[in-house]
């Protein structure tokens, strides 16, 4: 059984089912970069042509002419951010601006806030809102773009993200596999837990 089975159930569900992940990379000169990516979660037993019973993987497609890809080639260590916080547009519902810049709308302030709050409450399933985030540490492997393995993973990513077909099968892209090595989990009460293969 993969060590990731020790992760909180909600977090594991979040990793398996979210549409996007923030991918943080770093060059050999320690210059960081971050990108928002479509991805899939692949259990070790469903890897192409092999079985890994101890690890699970995050897999995404990247253009080969990006800083992110250059960084991965130079430094295979990456960090991945998953979260279920309220989306950024809705976070402003409970926050007052200190910039002094007027809001570009003719709707009265209080009425606008009530409308935003109503929309927010309509969108949220309170039973599902756990407000948890996790930074996943892992090591990458670039898959040969001409291989059957690459096609296998691209097909899986397409199945999960059909709206990204043009990007997934764009020329000069490559599949990147990230082995999940550790996780730092935080919630909205600033409680943090660290889990890794050695501590599972």
Swiss-Prot record:
What is the protein's major site of localization?
A: cytoplasm
Under the cellular component aspect of Gene Ontology, which terms does the record hold? cytoplasm; nucleus
Question: Where in or outside the cell is it found?
Answer: Cytoplasm; Nucleus
Give me the comment on cofactor binding.
Binds 1 FMN per subunit.
Q: What are the coiled-coil residue ranges?
A: none
Needed co-factor(s): FMN
Give UniProt keywords alphabetically: Cytoplasm, Flavoprotein, FMN, Nucleus
Q: Where does FMN bind?
A: 60, 68, 125
Pfam family, any one: PNPOx_N
Give the InterPro entries listed for this entry: PMP_oxidase-like, Pyridox_Oxase_N, Split_barrel_FMN-bd
Family statement drawn from the similarity comment of this UniProt entry: Belongs to the pyridoxamine 5'-phosphate oxidase family.
Q: What else is known?
A: Present with 358 molecules/cell in log phase SD medium.
Protein name in UniProt? Pyridoxamine 5'-phosphate oxidase homolog
Species for this entry: Saccharomyces cerevisiae (strain ATCC 204508 / S288c) (Baker's yeast)
